[in-house]
Amino acid sequence: MPEYIKIGRAPAVLYGEPAERAFLFVHGLCGNKEEAQRFAAVVNPLGWQVLAVELPEHNGRQDGVRLVPWEAVPELQNVRNYMKERWQTLGVRAVSLGAWLALQAFAGESVDYCLLSSPLLDMEKMICSMMAQAGISKERLRVEGEIPVPGGQTLSWRYLCWAREHSVSSISPKTSLLYGVKDEMTPRSTIDAYCRKFACSLTVAEGAAHWFHMPEEETRMSQWEREQLEK
């Protein structure tokens, strides 16, 4: 049975029987910690527990912590420290925005495995692209601080500065990426550049977009996860 706990203010759920190894699962935007149940079904039989945390402002979480990196990353660092005290071996399994946040939270650390699906890897580039589409200059954003744009999002000068100052790197020699060929969020060139720089394994899923959610896509994801751990 999953065990529901809190780590600081972060709600979390732990899957699997006691073990010496554990993955941290970090969901993406509009996701939730219970998404880790599918991943746990893959790795629990292989001797890994899975600890999944709820990102701020998700799944009814209303505790004052905001989904901005200067609040979410320190929270994940607290979770990281919690895990280091309890497990000998750690892995990271993260999705989309969760991947960007997790890579920052584990910067300077080394984990046994790092499995990233549809990862956001260059937030500065993504924000600048959104600014260009909305016709907003860096100078205007700097002066105004925050500017709402179509689609319900808000561009933030502080967020842009953070992204510029906190580029992500590798946290494991065993880093594997799963990328949908129709991903509308992250250009293939960004994925390829990261994989070349850090010698990562890349699996490209034909027909898939950024969000892997169809049954056949989830089956493909589970297969990919199992393959990485069996290498």
Functional labels for PLM-detected ranges:
Residues 1-17:
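N-terminal cap/lid segment of alpha/beta-hydrolase-fold proteins
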Residues 4, 109-193, 197-204, 208-231:
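The alpha/beta-hydrolase serine catalytic core
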Residues 20, 28-31, 181:
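Active-site glycine-rich loops that stabilize anionic/oxyanionic intermediates
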Residues 29-41, 189:
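The serine-hydrolase catalytic nucleophile loop
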Residues 40-62:
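Conserved alpha/beta-hydrolase
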Residues 58-84:
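Catalytic nucleophile-loop/oxyanion-hole region of alpha/beta-hydrolase
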Residues 92-94, 117:
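Short beta-strand immediately N-terminal to the catalytic nucleophile in serine-hydrolase-like folds
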Residues 94-102:
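Gly/Ala-rich beta-loop-alpha elbow adjacent to hydrolase catalytic centers
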